[in-house]
Amino acid sequence: MRTALLEVGLEELPASEFHSILRQLEEKSAELLKAYRISSGSVEVFVGSRRFGVILNNLPERQEDFTEEKKGPPLNIAYDENGKPTRALEGFLRNNNASLENVVHREGYVYLSRVVEGKPVEEVLPDLFRDLVLGLNFRKPMRWGSGEHEYVRPVHWIVAMVDGRVLDLEIFGLRSSRISYGKRYHAGSIEIPDPERYYESLKKGFVISSHLERKKFVLEQIDEFEKRSGMKIERDEELIEEIVAITEYPRIVVGQFDRKYLELPEEIIVTAVKHHQRSFIAHKETLTNIFVAFQDGPQPPENVVKGYERVINARLEDARYYFQKDLETSLEKMNEKLKEIVFQEKLGTLYDKVERIKKISQRLCEDLKLPEMFTQKVLEAASICKADIASKVVYEFPELQGVMGRIYALREGINEEIATAIEDHYSEEPQTVIGSILGIADRIDTIVGNFAIGNVPTSSKDPYGLKSKADTIFRIIRKNEWDISLEELLTFASSLVKYHLSEELETFFAGRFYQFLINELGISFDVARAVNHLWKKPLRGILSAEALQEISEKPEFQDLFVGFERVHNITKNHDSTKFDGALFEKEEEKKLMNKFYEVKEKVLKALERLNYREALQYLIELKPYIDEYFDNVFVMVKRDDLRVNRLSFLKNIDELFMMVGDMTYLVKRSQV
């Protein structure tokens, strides 16, 4: 078995492309190996800040053979009346370098059928690797040199080998070789003897090509620091992944900043150090002034540590200045400054948005029938929920939006419940009732406002994150079990921006509700379709979906489905529900009618309590009565009055089933 290597060397990759390249290499390698008929035991993908590529293990000597077929002329044209090949057939064979031995007859035509031997892998791999490299997609590709080529970053070298042999490959005007390059400024060219020794060869040049090994190396150094220092480092997965993406040989740097900055709120310190210097803060019961960073390359000299300390101290000094300045201004005054900050050009300022959030929040409180005293807390929180956007700290550290609002509110002595809601309403899963109300109001205003000015998301573009905001609204409603009319809230919010609730906006929310049910709750496609019309009252749709999903996985679903199906199939083109029980002639009609009235009362009471599981169990009770009815009663009799009366009666049962969900969308399960 053979091993192949492809390495593409480039200028520094943006960290934002790291996971995309990794995923594409994995997917496209598998696709291309299949397309080129090459079986591979395993595919190793690697991505670093200055290189990416693949190692293909356990390759065969050759491609797999395949049977080639080509359609030729019809049989009546290919042969004469004596069964001899005509000129048409002879020309077809000659043009395809084939003989009569390769001819088969099928469906009235001549076909060429011949086994084509696979080529040696070293002949095929150059094309496969070229397709792989050129088949990658990037968010923001760039041109370089004469502008002839476009790629994520300028490409400087290519290594392409099978075993110890260099492949004949040229891309971007560069010919492949066995020469790679180590860490810039620390190592020059590195000769790769063969793919098996690729990783160890690069390590000599301070490059760990495998992203998995780099991550392991980072975590090992953190573990070692903790054992040595007795301190703890929070394993921030996002930061660790970023370090892995931007380094090729991450080495730990331990430094410290001035202890005076520990007087700042912890959130400011962590943000300044993490987001702006990609460093961790060490803990020992409480936050310490020790930080851990990662330098790319060999063991960092002392001046590197000093450099980190100088930059972090400067950032924290700036943060302290901004924080102290902010403390001189109340949230109320910050809120007034929102009049100078545009939310969106056609939707006014952030102050205007806050006013709309207050009105939507009040309407939501009314819908939820919340006490007046609690409603006042909600409105107080709403009035300052965006105030910190005007603060100096948030201007410098936008990721602290909401966090600083809570901190400043507590410093002013504002009720903790209100202060917490300022931060909480930004969360995709708010933990407080006030935060949940503000979270819904804020997101509804943003979605409705954007639709009002024509910023409608598409399947591929959603620059304002409206889909995610809609999903969060459904998530909040489910968590709090709020039986509210989303349609009425949207209509009210629309009136605040002089917009009429459009079919386009309704379609958007219906679509997001469908995706929410499937992606977040694990509801099957047919059940999601069955309840999708209930998006206007999301909690009911969610509870109905969960109940239907649960019963669809049990044997009794058969009784529910068959009972509904027998009734619905015969009444689907009938509209009236007016019937006269006095016209019933058979005992089975009367028994089903009596059972229907009994079940209907139970179902309606269960639905009043939003107990869809119970409602479904009651509906199942109808199944034997429905079966008995259809076994003994002929519905489509010639007498118009009897036929219409029976259809109208059955239509009542059909509509009772439909109260739980549109069961016409349900797919029959295999269980019995």
Curated annotation (Swiss-Prot):
Organism of provenance: Thermotoga sp. (strain RQ2)
Quaternary assembly: Tetramer of two alpha and two beta subunits.
Origin superkingdom: Bacteria
GO terms assigned for molecular function: arginine-tRNA ligase activity; ATP binding; glycine-tRNA ligase activity
Name of protein: Glycine--tRNA ligase beta subunit
Entries under Pfam families matching the protein: DALR_1, tRNA_synt_2f
GO aspect biological process, one term: glycyl-tRNA aminoacylation
Alphabetic keyword roster: Aminoacyl-tRNA synthetase, ATP-binding, Cytoplasm, Ligase, Nucleotide-binding, Protein biosynthesis
PROSITE patterns: AA_TRNA_LIGASE_II_GLYAB
Reactions catalysed according to its record: tRNA(Gly) + glycine + ATP = glycyl-tRNA(Gly) + AMP + diphosphate
Annotated compartments: Cytoplasm
InterPro entries per the UniProt record, alphabetical: DALR_anticod-bd, Gly-tRNA-synth_bsu, Gly-tRNA-synth_heterodimer, tRNAsynth_Ia_anticodon-bd
The EC number(s) this enzyme carries: 6.1.1.14
GO (cellular component) term, any one: cytosol
Family stated for the protein in its record: Belongs to the class-II aminoacyl-tRNA synthetase family.
